[in-house]
C-alpha cells in the first residue's frame, strides 16, 4: 500500500509494517509501511529542491494554493470527519468540529502572518529602515494523535504560507488521517516536494529529527519525547525548534453560586475528548467543608451519567474511546497506582468492553495521597481539597508543567491573584480549561513547551526577521568620519 508522499508521488514504505484499527471495536482501518531512513532522506532532499521556487512564488500565489486546500476540506468535511472519528475513537460531532477548525486556520494564519511577520518600513535619514521576514527552508512537523487533523494543520498551514516546504511525520496511531489530509494538499495543486509525508514510529522520527537537511522542527506531543528532541537540538542554534507538550493542569473551584455551571465546566475541562486534550484539567482543587462535599458529590453524580460510546452511536456520546488499548491499560494502571498511593476512588474508571479502549470517567480524591507530577492523558481526574486560597495556589503551582490553569469563582480578586502567581501559558476564569482563542498564542512553559509555538504565534516560528537599511542611490556623505580622506 502506498502510504508515503515524496516529491509529489505516492510510494510504499520500505520500513516496518504498520496497521491501524478503530480503538472502540478493533475494526481494521488502515495498513501500510513506515518510511525507511533512505526514504526520509529522499523526502528531505525533495523538499529542499522544491523550496526555492515555492518561496519565490510570493504570498499571494501561495495563499491561492492554501485556499484551494481549504475548499477541498470543506467539500470533504463529512468524509474526513468520519476518518478522524474512526481512527481516534472520538464522537463524530467532535471530529466534524475539528475539520471546521482546520478550514478556519487558513484565514487566521494569513492574518497572523501579516501582523507577526509582515513588512514594516520607516524613514531613516536618506534611507529606509525595512523589516521583512524570510522562510527557514525545510521544516518538519511532528503531529499528535489526539487532534490528527487540526494540530499538525496548525503548523503546516502557516509554514507553507511563509514559504517553507514541509515534511509531515504524523503519529503512528493516526496514519489514515494524515494520508487523507495530504491527498487534499496534492489535489489543491501544491507543487511536488513542497509537502512530504513520512509514516512511522520511533525509527522514522529519529531519522527525520536528526536529518542535517532540516532547518526546523515543530513538535506537538508528550513532554518525554519533546524533552528528547530539545536535548537532541541543543547546541544547534541554526535550527528552529517549537515544542507544544502536555500539562498536569490545575483547576481551582471556589464556593460559586451556580454549582451546576461549575460542574459543567469541570466536566468539559476534564472529560471532553475522553480527557485527551493537553489542556484538560488533571487536578481539581475543591475547598474543604460542606460546600465542597456537596460540590464533589454533584460532580460525581453528573460524571457517572456521561454517555460513552462509539463515534457514530445514537444518541451521540459525550466521549468515545481513548486512542488505543495500550493507552486504556496505562490509564487503568494509573488509577490503581493512585489508589495504592493513598487515593480514595469517588468514581471508578472502568473499561466498557473487554479488548476495547472505551473507558468511563474516573475521579479519585488524592488529597491525602502521594501525587506523582505526571500527565494522565485520559478521563482520569484527581480531586484535591484545600483549606484556603493560599494553599490552593501552592498546590496548583506544585508541578514542573506550565500549560493551563484556571479558576471557577465569583471573585475577580481571587482570579487576579491566581493569574499573577500562576505559571502557565493559558489561564482561564469561569471558562473550561480546554477553551482557547484562535486569535491568541497557545503554548506553555516548563515541561509544557518552549513558550508559544502554536495558534496565533505559530507564524513567529515559520519565518525569521531580516532588518535592512535601503537607499535608492549611492552617494558620498556630506560629512566624513574622522580619519577618512577622500
UniProtKB/Swiss-Prot annotation:
List, from the UniProt record, the residues annotated as the active site of this protein.
244, 278
Keyword Glycoprotein in annotation: no
Q: Name one Pfam family in it.
A: Aldedh
UniProt keywords, alphabetically: Arginine metabolism, NAD, Oxidoreductase
- Report if keyword Signal is assigned: no
- Known catalytic reactions: N-succinyl-L-glutamate 5-semialdehyde + NAD(+) + H2O = N-succinyl-L-glutamate + NADH + 2 H(+)
* Pathways involved: Amino-acid degradation; L-arginine degradation via AST pathway; L-glutamate and succinate from L-arginine: step 4/5
Q: Where does NAD(+) bind?
A: 221-226
The record's listing under InterPro entries reads: Ald_DH/histidinol_DH (IPR016161), Ald_DH_C (IPR016163), Ald_DH_CS_CYS (IPR016160), Ald_DH_CS_GLU (IPR029510), Ald_DH_N (IPR016162), Aldehyde_DH_dom (IPR015590), SuccinylGlu_semiald_DH_AstD (IPR017649)
Q: Name one GO molecular function term.
A: succinylglutamate-semialdehyde dehydrogenase activity
Record-listed E.C. numbers: 1.2.1.71
HAMAP family from the entry? Answer: Aldedh_AstD (MF_01174)
Report what the protein is called. N-succinylglutamate 5-semialdehyde dehydrogenase
The scientific name of the source species is Chromobacterium violaceum (strain ATCC 12472 / DSM 30191 / JCM 1249 / CCUG 213 / NBRC 12614 / NCIMB 9131 / NCTC 9757 / MK)
Amino acid at each position: 500500500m502506498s502510504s508515503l508522499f515524496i516529491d509529489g508521488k505516492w510510494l510504499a514504505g520500505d520500513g516496518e509494517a504498520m496497521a491501524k484499527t478503530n480503538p472502540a471495536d478493533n475494526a481494521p482501518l488502515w495498513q501500510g509501511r513506515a518510511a525507511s531512513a533512505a526514504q526520509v532522506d529522499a523526502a528531505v532532499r525533495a523538499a529542499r529542491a522544491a523550496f526555492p521556487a515555492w518561496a519565490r512564488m510570493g504570498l499571494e500565489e501561495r495563499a491561492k494554493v492554501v485556499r484551494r486546500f481549504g475548499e477541498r476540506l470543506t467539500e470533504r468535511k463529512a468524509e474526513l470527519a468520519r476518518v478522524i472519528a474512526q481512527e481516534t475513537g472520538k464522537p463524530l460531532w467532535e471530529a466534524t468540529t475539528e475539520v471546521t477548525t482546520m478550514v478556519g486556520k487558513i484565514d487566521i494564519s494569513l492574518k497572523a502572518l501579516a501582523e507577526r511577520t509582515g513588512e514594516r518600513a520607516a524613514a531613516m535619514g536618506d534611507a529606509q529602515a525595512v523589516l521583512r521576514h524570510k522562510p527557514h527552508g525545510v521544516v518538519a512537523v511532528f503531529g499528535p494523535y489526539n487532534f490528527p487533523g487540526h494540530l499538525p494543520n496548525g503548523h503546516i498551514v502557516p509554514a507553507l504560507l511563509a514559504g517553507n516546504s514541509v515534511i509531515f511525520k504524523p503519529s503512528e496511531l493516526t496514519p489514515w488521517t494524515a494520508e487523507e489530509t495530504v491527498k487534499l494538499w496534492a489535489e489543491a495543486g501544491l507543487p511536488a516536494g513542497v509537502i512530504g509525508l513520512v509514516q512511522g514510529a520511533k525509527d522514522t522520527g529519529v531519522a527525520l529529527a536528526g536529518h542535517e537537511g532540516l532547518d526546523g522542527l515543530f513538535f506537538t506531543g508528550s513532554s518525554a519525547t519533546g524533552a528528547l528532541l530539545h536535548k537532541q537540538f541543543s547546541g544547534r542554534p541554526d535550527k528552529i525548534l517549537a515544542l507544544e507538550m502536555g500539562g498536569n493542569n490545575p483547576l481551582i473551584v471556589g464556593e460559586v453560586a451556580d454549582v451546576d455551571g461549575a460542574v459543567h465546566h469541570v466536566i468539559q475541562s476534564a472529560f471532553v475528548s475522553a480527557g485527551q486534550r493537553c489542556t484538560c484539567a488533571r487536578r481539581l482543587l475543591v475547598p474543604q467543608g460542606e460546600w465542597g462535599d456537596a460540590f464533589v458529590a454533584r460532580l460525581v453524580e453528573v460524571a457517572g451519567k456521561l454517555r460513552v460510546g462509539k463515534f457514530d452511536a445514537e444518541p451521540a456520546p459525550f466521549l468515545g474511546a481513548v486512542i488505543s488499548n495500550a493507552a486504556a491499560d496505562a490509564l487503568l494502571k494509573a488509577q490503581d497506582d493512585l489508589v495504592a498511593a493513598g487515593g480514595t476512588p469517588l468514581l471508578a474508571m472502568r473499561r466498557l468492553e473487554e479488548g476495547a479502549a472505551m473507558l468511563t470517567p474516573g475521579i479519585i480524591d488524592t488529597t491525602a495521597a502521594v501525587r506523582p507530577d505526571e500527565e494522565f492523558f485520559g478521563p482520569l481526574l484527581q480531586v484535591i481539597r484545600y483549606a484556603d486560597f493560599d494553599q490552593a495556589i501552592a498546590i496548583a503551582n506544585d508541578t514542573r508543567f506550565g500549560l493551563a490553569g484556571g479558576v471557577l469563582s465569583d471573585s475577580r480578586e481571587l482570579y487576579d491573584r491566581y493569574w499573577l502567581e500562576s505559571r502557565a501559558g493559558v489561564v482561564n476564569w469561569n471558562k473550561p480549561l480546554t477553551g482557547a482563542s484562535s486569535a491568541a498564542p497557545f503554548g506553555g512553559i516548563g515541561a509544557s513547551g518552549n513558550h508559544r509555538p502554536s495558534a496565533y504565534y505559530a507564524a513567529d516560528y515559520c519565518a525569521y526577521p531580516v532588518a535592512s537599511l535601503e537607499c535608492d542611490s549611492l552617494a558620498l556623505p556630506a560629512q566624513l568620519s574622522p580619519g577618512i580622506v577622500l
